[in-house]
UniProtKB/Swiss-Prot annotation:
Full protein name: Histone H2A.z
UniProt keyword Cell membrane present: no
PROSITE patterns: HISTONE_H2A
GO CC annotations on file: nucleosome; nucleus
Top-level taxonomy: Eukaryota, Amoebozoa, Evosea, Eumycetozoa, Dictyostelia
Family, similarity comment: Belongs to the histone H2A family.
Annotated GO MF terms: DNA binding; protein heterodimerization activity; structural constituent of chromatin
């Protein structure tokens, strides 16, 4: 092989582009988020680091909600057998049981098919009454 052949082979090898998500170690698409941010910002000047940061935040929130939802599914599968799917009901219960997520998502958010949060008012709950004995009443009156 001559020198020109070896250099031409080196030139023909192109380095495959590595996605920004892979570089950042994320699953959410950093490039797509960056493009969407550029479309929304009036000056169209957005740092790539802000896109990476936003993608990381969204990925964390999604994983947190998914983890809580899976725990709700496991709780219900103990009560009702053969529960194997995540439903909107599980999602709603997971969000409402976590105080921080509830505060974050509470404002004008409705999950379709989620139902309502189970709540029994204190007045409607049965109150256990202690049995009163006539002897106890007499001792109270005598004092």
């Amino acid at each position: 092989m001559t020198e020109s052949e070896t250099t031409s082979k080196k030139v023909n090898k192109r380095v495959k582009p590595v996605p920004k998500s892979t570089k950042a170690g994320l699953i959410f698409p950093v490039g797509r988020i960056h493009r969407m941010l550029k479309n929304k910002v009036p000056l169209k000047r957005v740092s790539i680091l802000s896109s990476v940061y936003l993608a990381a935040i969204l990925e964390y929130l999604a994983s947190e909600v998914l983890e809580l939802t899976i725990s709700q599914v496991s709780i219900q599968s103990k009560e009702y057998h053969n529960v194997r799917r995540i439903s909107p009901r599980h999602l709603l219960l997971a969000i409402k049981t976590d105080e921080e997520l509830d505060n974050l998502i509470r404002v004008s958010t409705t999950i379709a098919g989620g139902g309502v949060i189970p709540y029994i008012h204190e007045v409607l709950k049965k109150v256990e009454q202690k049995p009163t004995h006539p002897q106890q009443k007499q001792t109270i009156k005598s004092i």
